[in-house]
Amino acid sequence: MSKIKKFIKKKKKSKIVSLTAYSKNIASILDNYCDLILVGDSLGSVLYNYKSTREVNLSTMIEHSKSVRMGIKKSLMIVDMPHNTYRTPKEAVKNAKQIMKKTKCDGCLLYTSPSPRDNTGS
């Protein structure tokens, strides 16, 4: 059974544990306790003292994700896609493929806002 299928099966039965890592050493410690490890664009604020996560670029996320991947044996690894790397669907797919190929992550995370046309009335 794949890691993703195991994750989904576990999620249906119990709560999952997810934490953020930016390096191999931290990831190797967290791997024993987490179901999912996120490489967050928050590394800009935490490690580089950026005022905003919007200053983080794709190459920085890829390099940190490659480091984190080396510390993970069992957890899923998800990588934040930096701001302005998914302005169009085509750009999102291109950059997600690049992240996944170079880092061997299990998925990419991007943040969106509801479209004004998506008014659900709630």
Predicted regions, residues:
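Hydrophobic faces of well-ordered beta-strands that scaffold small-molecule active sites
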Residues: V17-T20, I37-V39, M77-M81, C108
